[in-house]
Amino acid sequence: MRIFQGSYQEFDSIFIENNHIKMTIIPEIGGKIASIIYKPQAFEILFQPSEPYRMPIYGDSFEKYDTSGIDEMFPNIDISDYPYGISNMVTLKDHGELWSVPWGASIDRSRIITQVAGTELEYSFKRIVEVKNNQIFLDYVVTNNSKKSILGIWAFHGLLACDEMTQIFLPTDKVINVHDSSVLGKAETLHSFPVTKDLQARDYRLDRIGSPLLKKAEKYYVCGKLKTGQASLTLNKNQLLCKMNFNEKKIPYLGVWINEGGYKNQYNCALEPSTGYYDSIM
């Protein structure tokens, strides 16, 4: 295993690599994990941007930028006022404030440590990355640097390079649609998983991903809090099984994003463990 510095798409980057995995981190762009290559199959796991990266402007709209790879969402996702325990109301930015600011980075033997300080609220956010064989370990530490409690939510925002053979496996038989949908109906509709009924009472597979020609996107959450912190899906035409494991006591919610060309004309999906249900801290 080796860790080295270099350039990725014209940005200073840190690489961690062994016989199974090569990962690329761009500290300057919100600590983004830009690439994960599974070397035995020469397969890029993460959805890649179609245009060069641009340096984000703090407080700007998330969708104006690359929407690729893995970004950290904290302390919010939806734009929202923060009224809790502070004298002056502050507005939390779109998709949080971490993705649009440069992070610091250091190498500690076999680990990459990236960290950043909050802007609107007084906290520090640290992520520790380590690769062992064919596994990636992500550890997080959020430190409150103020004298008052800080409330917020964290979500893992990792866009994956899916295809029409991708299959999703979740530890549940019930999910909740969180977007109004021409297929799944109004937001907050309860559905069976993996097979439900669409608005025409036809069988609809929630565990599969359709063609990018469908020009639609769906998002749903596992119903209620997780009993088991795990989820997985197949990639690279069913040749690769990608598993996620996390502590369901600390991260009790799980969202699924399926983009079949409906958002920014892109084709990707995401498994999104989070500390709060959906995107609001209110």
Predicted regions and their residues:
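Surface-exposed acidic/polar loop and edge beta-strand patches at domain peripheries
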Residues: 1-137, 145-282
